[in-house]
Amino acid sequence: MADAASQVLLGSGLTILSQPLMYVKVLIQVGYEPLAPTVGRNIFGRQVCQLPGLFCYAQHIASIDGKRGLFTGLTPRLCSGVLGTVVHGKVLQHYQECDKAEESGSGNVQKEVSSSFDRVIKETTREMMARSAATLITHPFHVITLRSMVQFIGRESKYCGLCDSIATIYREEGILGFFAGLIPRLLGDIISLWLCNSLAYLVNTYALDSGVSTMNEMKSYSQAVTGFFASMLTYPFVLVSNLMAVNNCGLAGGCPPYAPIYSSWIDCWCMLQKEGNMSRGNSLFFRKVPFGKTYCCDLRMLI
């Protein structure tokens, strides 16, 4: 119980600290660029046309809504984080209880030791089920978080309170409105998890020497590196999910010119791929203007 409480508190603290970062990231993902590009230099010293980074973008938001405005959407995101942690823990706890029941039921019969690969498959499958359950239950809060952020673009106040936002979505879109963008989000999470754990297994098994004294440390490093690599590869799923969550919801940021009305998440994916925007919002620093794009001052976006 104390373990779960500490996880919730730690997660909530990290959520609060990272809220301004997520706010900026979401607005960039939608395509909103309130500040014109400037001429700067990249890491190799070459002159490039750069878009404002995280700090300039955050400063712009604070100049309009104050520093408190940087924490728009925090309440539903905290609810999502707390509920997700609890659900994730409960699902894993259920699997642990099932294992104990099997062990006690088998009596003194010696269980066959499973291979490390089988163990990875088993643990990854359980983690996938736990994450999927948490994502499914918390997605409505995720949708509200995104929409409350995106309304900054049109200066709307449609999604302000948690209860009012729930009522608005249900009234206008029904139950399905709470799960806009769920499928690409689930797919991205699942692919990222399996990719991360599979790569970590291969690295730990075939690339690292088991005789090294710091083996456990090396394994934790490899897990972190493969996790970062997997998240980079599956970023398009995150982008598509977030865009579908705000698409055609009555906000300026979810309608043309910032986004066409997508018929499905696959349509959104194809459109982004065609425009070369699959990595939009992936980087918050050293953001250069993509080749062939120009900045439109009136629309505050790249066209």
From Swiss-Prot:
Location relative to the cell: Mitochondrion outer membrane
Pfam families, sorted: Mito_carr
Membrane recorded as keyword: yes
Residue spans of the Solcar repeats: 2-98, 118-206
Residue intervals annotated with topology Mitochondrial intermembrane: 2-15, 93-135, 200-231
Residue ranges, Cytoplasmic side: 37-77, 157-180, 253-280
Keyword terms of this UniProt record: Acetylation, Membrane, Mitochondrion, Mitochondrion outer membrane, Repeat, Transmembrane, Transmembrane helix
One GO biological process term: protein insertion into mitochondrial outer membrane
TM annotation in the entry: 16-36, 78-92, 136-156, 181-199, 232-252, 281-303
Molecular function GO labels: membrane insertase activity
Functional note: Protein insertase that mediates insertion of transmembrane proteins into the mitochondrial outer membrane. Catalyzes insertion of proteins with alpha-helical transmembrane regions, such as signal-anchored, tail-anchored and multi-pass membrane proteins. Does not mediate insertion of beta-barrel transmembrane proteins. Also acts as a receptor for the truncated form of pro-apoptotic BH3-interacting domain death agonist (p15 BID) and has therefore a critical function in apoptosis. Regulates the quiescence/cycling of hematopoietic stem cells (HSCs).
Protein's name in the database: Mitochondrial carrier homolog 2
Organism field: Bos taurus (Bovine)
Lineage, highest ranks first: Eukaryota, Metazoa, Chordata, Craniata, Vertebrata
